[in-house]
């Protein structure tokens, strides 16, 4: 028997765990592509639904294909009554990621994927319903309102989410920001949640189980939630100078500052500059100059003191805040977007599958002598 290849490095950093045609991350120290398309081009020019089609169907849609795709998604927004009933039982103090995990799992019970031929239809249903799941729970548990999730007045997923959350039609600026944000978060190669989805898929499990496992993985603070932590940090400061003093204290105390650095990117996160542009535009549109100034100062101090760059999460915090999105819902938006990447990886794993079963290096005790229970201790 040949020896298994030893994989060094904590968390398998720097190790290849498989092949993918979906995404490249940090190939030049800064780059990000989806199926060969640069993230900057997609973020500047594409609607999120075009990106979803690219990842899930395999190509950028024609206008006719995009219209059909969006029409299909709009028609899938109505929450099943039994799912509504379940969401109404979840208390307001529940973690929103638990709501997403539970909602996905219940959907898998109500509308199971019977064969892999149904994977595209099952994914489209989740893509249409995930904004409805989080907003229905939030509005009912916090406001006592039962929203009509079958609303068809917004043709984009981002616009629909904002309409369900606030009850008001979003501005065109807000719609554009959501297209960009959802595009930036859509896919990122073998991150922890995506790899969890692929491991689950490799057992030939159903797609709802794969996505539920991915949501549970993203719930962990070392993977998801960085934009929420960044928001909690920056909103405590009322000026750029106060922010600089605060960051210097945190650095002196060796506290972790969320939203900076990345496991793969060496020079910069290309998503940061893209969402930062929108954060600035939003700050001007809503007349909130101080939070953006605080964010910029924190970015400058971290670069000066630690030579660390912002990742995608940092300026997302202020961008979401400017649009009136509660901080606790930041990570569920990530789920609404990353579903496209998770599902595309599930499809890819299924198409060329072998169960993922790595080896481990045993570090426990060697041979032990059995003792009857009365002789132990």
Report each predicted region and the residues it spans.
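Non-transmembrane, aqueous-exposed alpha-helical and coiled segments at domain scale
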Residues: 1-377
């Amino acid at each position: 028997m040949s020896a298994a290849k030893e994989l060094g490095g904590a968390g398998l950093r720097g190790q290849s765990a498989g092949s993918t045609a979906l995404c490249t991350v940090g190939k030049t120290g800064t780059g990000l592509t989806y199926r060969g398309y640069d993230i900057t081009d997609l973020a500047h020019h594409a609607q999120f639904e075009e990106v979803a089609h690219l990842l899930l169907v395999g190509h950028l849609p024609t206008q006719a294909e995009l219209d059909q795709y969006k029409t299909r998604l709009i028609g899938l927004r109505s929450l099943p009554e039994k799912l509504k009933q379940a969401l109404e039982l979840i208390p307001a103090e529940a973690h929103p990621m638990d709501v997403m995990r539970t909602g996905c799992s219940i959907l898998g019970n109500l509308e199971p994927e019977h064969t892999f031929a149904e994977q595209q239809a099952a994914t489209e249903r989740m893509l249409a319903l995930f904004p409805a799941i989080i907003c229905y729970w939030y509005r009912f548990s916090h406001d006592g309102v039962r929203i009509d999730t079958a609303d068809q007045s917004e043709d984009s997923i981002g616009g629909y989410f904002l309409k369900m959350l606030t009850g008001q039609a979003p501005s065109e600026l807000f719609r554009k920001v959501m297209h960009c944000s959802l595009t930036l978060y859509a896919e990122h190669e073998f991150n922890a949640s995506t790899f969890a989805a692929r491991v689950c898929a490799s057992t030939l499990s159903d797609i709802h189980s794969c996505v539920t496992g991915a949501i549970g993985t993203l719930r962990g603070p070392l993977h998801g939630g960085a934009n929420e932590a960044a928001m909690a940090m920056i909103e405590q400061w009322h000026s750029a100078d106060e922010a600089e003093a605060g960051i210097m204290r945190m650095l002196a105390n060796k506290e972790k500052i969320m939203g900076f650095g990345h496991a793969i990117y060496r020079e910069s996160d290309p998503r940061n500059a893209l969402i930062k542009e929108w954060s600035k535009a939003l700050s001007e549109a809503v007349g909130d100059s101080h939070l953006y100034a605080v964010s910029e100062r924190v970015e400058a101090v971290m670069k000066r003191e630690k030579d660390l760059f912002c990742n995608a999460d940092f300026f997302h915090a202020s961008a979401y805040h400017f649009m009136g999105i509660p901080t606790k819902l930041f990570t569920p938006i990530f789920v609404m977007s990353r579903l496209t990447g998770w599902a595309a990886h599930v499809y890819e794993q299924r198409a060329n599958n072998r169960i993922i079963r790595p080896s481990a290096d045993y570090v426990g005790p060697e041979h032990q002598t059995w003792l009857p229970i009365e002789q132990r201790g």
